Amino acid sequence: MAGVLLVFYLDGFVLGAPVALLLVWALLGVVVLVGFLRHAVHGPAGRVQWPAVALAALAALGVLVLTRGASASAVLATALVGAAGGALEAAGRSRQRWQGVAAPVYCGAFAGMTSQLVLGHPSWVVLAGGLAGLVLSVLSDSWSGIGGKLGTTAFLGVVGVMGLAVAAGAMGSGASLHPFTAVERSLVLILSLLSPLVTHALSYRLGLGVVLGSALPSILLAILLGALPAALQLEPVPLSAAWLGASFVGMTAPERLAPRPLPLLLAMGLLFALLSFSFAPRLAGIGGDL
């Protein structure tokens, strides 16, 4: 996993960066890698949970139906599918039913965000969702309580399937990123600072769980931004994606943030915003790259 993320980091931030920023990104990458390895807390590899594989594949399909079939935004579709999984798990909690459903559903939904310009045929994306569910079940005892694990796992699933797509000649040219205006950059910064705080409070203080804590506000924000008048010249999808991505920070468990959760959440949200501004991969549109 660390190797794949290193390639992702090099592609997204280091390659093609101005000389003045190369050292900054290189040093930051080393810090991130050290922290990643230090806090991995690897347990034994888990067994492949086939229900989790099926749920993740089904979730990816659900996002495809909403985005490619119903023209919903990728953020709204992903949050809706994730919220459905979270609600199902919450509804069965009292009777100990449907436990463990939310995580593979949300993970598969992230894989389903993959652009049609990357993996054109839906079957590739569904396969990526299933692979993400498989990886998630195997790594069930690794990186526990670290926000972003589900998205990272989805990214690994998509990258794995991309290798097959390249071999089959079915790989797309990739999507293009939205260039933020000055106003949008300010909004991304604000959203990236607020989202972790809201997500963490809903997830742990109110006891909704991390999936609902991330998905429910993301649904609301995606709807509100989509309803803004065109005269404001704000692109709702990149802004709502910033909120969704920053919400992964807020999914981090309290014990990982002790004894100063608020400063850490704000610092991580700020770092997320700065990374969002500089993210310029050769191939955009991969599910899980938030």
Name each model-derived stretch.
Residues 1-34, 44-57, 72-79, 86-170, ...:
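C-terminal transmembrane helix-loop-helix hairpin of multi-pass membrane proteins
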Residues 37-40:
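Non-catalytic propeptide/linker segments at domain boundaries
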